[in-house]
């Protein structure tokens, strides 16, 4: 009887210890992970941070302008300003899902299968594969959006539209068994950050989940974070770069080889693959960043046994 009781006690202790190990985060055995000896370099058009204020100065006096911010082998992102009364042609992407964030102004969005809606500051909009859509700028001020798609994504147009000229290409009348994509996996046509933030418990959520791209709303307050640890260099991603659009407040970015960057609303921060970074909310008020990369479950590789 004594031996049986002892065995049961030891088994119970083993379960408790295992639970404590899992909570401490030390239950995962360390792995050898490759990392280049030299810190990856930034290749144009990429910069550690693209300031919205600088873009506005660069394009001052223009009602319509665009500038590519991200153009790597995973994603393509660009800022687009459009004047009131202008609109895109009706179009669709044959194999990719597109999304954009409205930074300023008002956009009337028409998406096949959805009721038209108006997107404003804080709005995030996405259009699934093979789904026809158009964007119209309304109101009395230009609208500014940050638009993202898969690298080298192609654009098709319905027959009633006149496609733009593309050097080296011709336009053919084609069919592709087009089927508008679904809003599955929790994807939605439109959300607005400020509507979401009316819930005091809101601290972010994935906005766009696709096989080859991912956009995550990360929202909160610096006061809710653990104390800043300058020795914690965060994590890196071994398969692709990552970028963020600051949607509200300020975000602090220690980036390997670049020092500390404080990014504000409208700024875009970019970190190449294999580069350590440790973003966190900064300042007294609420802050939000939209994290964008090419993998729905991207690996966050950190130094073993250090909190991230």
Walk through the language-model features, giving the residues of each:
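N-terminal secretory signal peptides that target proteins for export/translocation
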Residues: 1-2
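Bacterial N-terminal signal peptides
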Residues: 6-16
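A short, N-terminal "cap"/entry segment at the start of jelly-roll beta-barrel domains
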Residues: 22-76, 89-90, 155-227, 233, ...
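Short histidine-centered beta-strand/loop micro-motifs
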Residues: 66-69, 79, 88-94, 111, ...
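Short, conserved secondary-structure segments in the cores of folded domains
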Residues: 78, 98, 115, 123, ...
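Short, conserved beta-strand element in jelly-roll/cupin
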Residues: 81-83, 93-109, 222-224, 236-253
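Short acidic-glycine-tyrosine-enriched beta hairpin
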Residues: 113-129, 257-273
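Ligand-binding loop in jelly-roll beta-barrel domains
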Residues: 123, 129-156, 273-300
